[in-house]
Amino acid sequence: MRPHLVIIDGMALLFRSYFASAAMGHFVRLPDGTPSNGAQGFVRHVLTAETIMKPTHLAICWDMGATTFRNEIYDGYKANRPAPPEEMLPQFAMAKQLAARIGWKNYGIAGYEADDLISVMAKKWEDDAHITIISGDKDLLQLLTPTTRIALTQKGYSQYNIYTANRFVEEYGIQPQQFAAVKAFMGDTSDGYPGVKGIGEKTALQLIQKYHSIDGVLASLSQLTPAQQRKIQADEAMLHMSYELAQLTAEAPLTADLSELMVTPYEAATFEQLAQDGYTLIAKHARSLYPFS
């Protein structure tokens, strides 16, 4: 039977968990006063995902630091994002430590984003496993294949908007690997790159549907409206740069064996110790999900 590998976008789940409870002023402090709401929420989310997705293998990928190779391409990349709140700062390391204590494998490489490591893993093992990627980031849709699906997070711990390659083609009218070209035209306000000013998602998608690639659009400029021609010619350099930024790399120097990621049964003692250390929400959640003897 083919393995089922679940790859978690750790930073996406951590931020999501933090802001879901911080908005109500719930920071769930440990006995020493350290806030833990994001880290405990992250672990609870992964535990719940395991019961839903039933993976045989599991990996968690993390961003490592504020700058990556994309900042060398464009210094405005993600420059518009605010710094994390002070209460969240100790929870980055906390989340990774909790994951390791539970037995999950953490991966992060300086200079690369979690998305890039996810990309490397998905491409490395797409012929060996069924793969589910859990994230809130639609950029990952470009990784869809017949064996890789994307589970986009929704409200709570158990709701997902699941994309397969077939669903993506039906909805977008392009292949998943063409999605980065759409992003290059429309830009990404969250990541801070503009694409072609005046070209939105609808037009960007229509261009790639009709001309298939950035080169295809540029070779057919005379067939576009005068306004579209002007916009693309004015921002052609930014268009190419945005395409570099939108593509997920397969070049990150990740060394990992699928066998290292095998999920093993949990032991009650692991969560009892976490409860003693103040992580009571995790312990309670684990007991509600798993029949410890």
Predicted segments — roles?
Residues 138-139, 202:
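Acidic, divalent-metal-coordinating active-site segment for phosphoryl/phosphodiester hydrolysis
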Residues 2, 56, 147, 162-293:
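Non-catalytic nucleic-acid-binding/docking modules located in mid-to-C-terminal regions
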Residues 2-131, 142-149, 154-158, 237-241, ...:
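Noncatalytic, basic helical substrate-engagement surface that gates or grips nucleic-acid strands
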Residues 139-142, 157-159, 215, 225:
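Short gly/pro/ser/thr-enriched loop/turn and capping motifs at secondary-structure boundaries
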Residues 8, 136, 199:
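Single, functionally critical "micro-switch" positions that shape active/binding sites
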